[in-house]
Amino acid sequence: MQLNNLKPAAGSKHAKRRVGRGIGSGLGKTAGRGHKGQKSRSGGFHKVGFEGGQMPLHRRLPKRGFTSLTKEFTAEVRLGDLAGLPIEEVDLLSLKQAGLVGEMVKSAKVILSGEIDKKVTLKGIGATAGAKAAIEAAGGSLA
């Protein structure tokens, strides 16, 4: 076997179909475009989503939702993650150093997810009602 003798397997390659080249080809005259109509004309196309003048679906349906501008600057911290911290007084800086919130975060809130059994004092951090009750039950407080 030599490189100049290599050929693709029989039937694996198909010749490009040439349209509009006589009736014997099966795609002569109208070249597979049918008779008349916008799609048969040269340059005949319509925009994506165009429905023939009918009000398009994306305009018939109402707008919904929005993008929050504060999303990347706020974070939530799980109660179980607080229990794993080696410090007793928790503020935003200590959460950033522990890697629990991102560097861009300006405010955080503790949510009731997991358990806490050690005393923790939160400074400048919010907490949900359930998380606040759990922290106070463990002997901690919110400052």
From Swiss-Prot:
Official protein name in the record: Large ribosomal subunit protein uL15
Annotated SUPFAM superfamilies: Ribosomal proteins L15p and L18e
Tagged with keyword rRNA-binding: yes
Subunit note: Part of the 50S ribosomal subunit.
Top-rank taxon: Bacteria
The keyword Transferase is annotated on this UniProt entry: no
GO cellular component labels: cytosolic large ribosomal subunit
Known role: Binds to the 23S rRNA.
Annotated keywords: Ribonucleoprotein, Ribosomal protein, RNA-binding, rRNA-binding
Gly residues biased stretches: 21-31
Biological process terms in GO annotation: translation
A single MF term (Gene Ontology): structural constituent of ribosome
Region of interest (Disordered), residue spans: 1-57
Similarity-based family: Belongs to the universal ribosomal protein uL15 family.
Gene name, Swiss-Prot/TrEMBL: rplO
Residue pairs linked by disulfide bridges in the UniProt entry: none
